[in-house]
Amino acid sequence: QFEDELVKIWNKPKFVKNSNYVITLDRINNLELIEKILNHININEQIKEWQELGIVDDTFKVKEVFENDIYGKKLTKKYEHLPIDTKYFKDLELEILSQFEDLDNALDGWLIKSENYQALNTILPKFKEKVQTIYIDPPFNLDSSDQFLYRTNYKDANWATLLENRLRIAREWLNEKGSIFVRCDYNGNWIVRCLLDEIFGKENFRNELIVRRFKKNVMEKEIKKLPEGLDTIYLYSTSEKFSYINPYKLKSEKREGFWRHMGDSSGQGSPKIFFGKELAPPKGKHWKYSQEKINQMIDEGKLILECRNCGYIHDKSKGLWQGCPECGIDDLIPKYWVEEKIEEVLDSNWSDIYGYSTTWDFPTENSETLLKRVIESTSNKNDLIMDFFLGSGTTTAVAHKLGRKWIGVEMGEHFYSVV
């Protein structure tokens, strides 16, 4: 009974301690209000933060934010995107927020500093079934936490419980076309697969992706094993309706364009008209394209007839087929032009890109290239992206750059210094 009471307390939605807004100057359509902000008693604290973040240098002057033209005073292009943090201007916060008729819709994203289970549970009513894509890279199930800013030395059962509790709530955040990516390594991929099968359903498993990781020099430690070079990312959807756009990658070698025989598709088909000549496909085969498509390809110069006997080529410039002018034999094969190819549809092997990055010297910082592929393959502009093991903030940063809305949850102090 005591344990049940503890569970009830743990699951009770928590109160928000405080909330602040970061709004760029160009979004505030009130010059008088901007002047109030820039003349505020706390503006020096805001400037100090800008300097620490590298947004302005030590020579910055408030008066440089405005300029005058024939229409009067306006924001300069150089400083119109300076971000105002309302934590420094609490007495002006309501006036700033009143500039937006629909504040929720105006916001690009939400950053939440909290233990993630409590955040997911508390804010669920606001975002239930509204998220399109979730990406998480939870703490790996390792023996030690020495190299990380967060705990990784969980027992298998504890680690499984930690993930299960959060994944169950996270599923409720996803809409019917939504999907989730969960990154893990060889220590825990078997646990993650079982959990995702149970929570999302085996029928909603989509892919087991592999991504590159940093290799450790195991030879120096005299460990008799191959260095781990890959991590796993499991992709699950909420239903058959899930949104997916095939990503492409550059081919290692460019494939030149070429003429290809049109009659190599299995299954007997009917004759088609080529340059006024009716041709039946080979026995047991059918012409690859419809008559409408064949006519279009002829008009575009992308279809020819080749004489099997002498190799004579008949194309659009020669009009209707009147027989082979070279050998007189009427034995033809239609061919169509296959364009050169520098890209190919990506498969589940994502080792062509780096899975980690060192931009911020943050342990296990996921690369922007990886997150770009994740987000573009499962969402569209203005869709909502979430990461509740945010770490260095790559997911929300890339979502923002790609024109998506975003939610990030992180509890560490790097929430302020890195995210």
Predicted regions and their residues:
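Class I S-adenosyl-L-methionine
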Residues: 4-384, 415-416
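Glycine-rich SAM-binding Motif I of class I
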Residues: 143, 393, 397
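Hydrophobic/aromatic ligand-binding patch that stacks against planar heteroaromatic rings
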Residues: 172, 397-398
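Class I SAM-dependent methyltransferase "Motif I" SAM/SAH-binding loop
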Residues: 389-391
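Short beta-strand element of Class I
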Residues: 405-407
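Conserved acidic E/D residue at the C-terminus of a beta-strand in Rossmann-like folds
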Residues: 409-411
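Conserved SAM-binding loop
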Residues: 419
